[in-house]
């Protein structure tokens, strides 16, 4: 391709096909003009892959470095360096954690996009040398009644859930936690965030880099095909759902190949045969080879003829950037090759030696005895970085006075509404107990009568009762109104979800989903989100160990800002984990912490179409106090549930479901309007159940609301607010989501 003599118009056409800007194409033209030759198609495609938004974070890197750099603590092993974060678990083990988005593929082909998102996040953990032990997914869908898009919303919902189910279940890795959220702002543009936790002995962690010159590069696992070509490019621009080429950019997943690949990789690692490793995700070989060599300050030579193909007619550039799944790139000393072959043959894993690392700065690639690529790795890897401008949106919305004339009806509507109702129709499709290490499941309580858990707890090491708690979610409607406040509340909720299990909050992983970064208001939301994450992480001395940014999530308009927060915690003894359901009748119920009172961005305000945009940041110093109360008194706590979606009324009702134990509470000591105290979702509040003998202790720590009993009664002073049977509410709660699946 004659880039050197291209006109500006022709450069723009080429750039558009590769998701590169005019200025980026000028940089490429300038470079090749200086070296007095045109790029090969392999070189041009590789540059486009490396410089894509998806791969190099060119719109976010400046702000990520400014606000989120070095948020570590004494437990951090690796953070923001390799394919996943690594955190100390105990003296002998570490855990590995990562979350990624797979949004654009899931919008085009929901089943395949979601399935390969799961497969990819598992390999991100695997390539660090860890055994994957748990999956997490947070899903954001449009209005399930919407049929106006390229694909109906129900088709997207069912495709995504089925893809996650089939891939995870067939691999035998439990799906233990996550969230599901619905809003018309995601119509035709779902957000699919998949997370994974792995466990490894601390001396078995593998880095995503080549360690020394002369090491061979081995490609193993699935064969390379035309699926997933230009995947990173189409994920780096606004999605055109009418473009048929997008379907070719969606990878094809095969868990039957990945399952033995996991066993083989772990065995090779146990034998000490792997010196560096990376999974092949976005960008394929182009990304994996380039990043491993550059991280090791080495160059190398690759022979594309050695790559095992699904289609022998593939062109060299297609081989180089294909994103075919279930592939791993391993570096090793050449003397280890016979042992490596024995292990891979035992697991029936295909492999080939495709090249080696060398003491030079360039990467050379050959195909059919012809050099098709010869570039310095520094040119490919030192990608453009933009300091995108941002501005605060004008406050176009004003709150309007509101009074609810039928609280009883509102509570009934709320409990069956799509963002409060039971997630069991989805959760039950996932195997959350395979491997036998899930202690607190996503549903808790009596069989067929369960309620939601706030966080899952897993026991990852056989000879230890220590465990990991994990939760994931976001508050998109509030993020739209107040990006800093919405991100802060997302972090507060995650923190509460961890501490109510009895665990110690440990690490944060973010997956930041936003619209077009060229929109200054979108960038404002993004920057405010980063500030909130920084402030919260520093305040609570946590560690931010891994993250992901997904831009260009847009169809008709940008999606709502969706900073998904995955948080982990460490629990000393999983046998003492606290769950959400009420345990006994005639126990006492207390409110610990405080309800913010704002109805901005709540399920209730959406349900009632309330114009409410007034929000003030919750007091995170109060959250410190809540943490200390739970930590110092967890042996006395029978049940605990955070106040979040649906407010305190939803929290209390959900606690009643697990064992059919009701409550009689009086909200008179919560000093705000009835609508606000019932339905505000923000703040530091947690509802706990304690035995009668602990009354004196907790009278000094929180607000006594009432006691557990047979049915449900809510008072506000002398006024009856709500009265119902548990069974009636459970039927409503159970029926909200099932009709869409």
From Swiss-Prot:
CDD domains (alphabetical): PurL_repeat1, PurL_repeat2
Pathway: Purine metabolism; IMP biosynthesis via de novo pathway; 5-amino-1-(5-phospho-D-ribosyl)imidazole from N(2)-formyl-N(1)-(5-phospho-D-ribosyl)glycinamide: step 1/2
Enzyme Commission code(s) on record: 6.3.5.3
Entry binding sites for Mg(2+) 2: 124, 279
GO cellular component labels: cytoplasm
Residues reported to bind ATP: 57, 98, 510, 547
UniProt keyword annotation of Amino-acid biosynthesis present: no
PANTHER family: PHOSPHORIBOSYLFORMYLGLYCINAMIDINE SYNTHASE SUBUNIT PURL (PTHR43555:SF1)
Protein's UniProt name: Phosphoribosylformylglycinamidine synthase subunit PurL
Native organism: Picrophilus torridus (strain ATCC 700027 / DSM 9790 / JCM 10055 / NBRC 100828 / KAW 2/3)
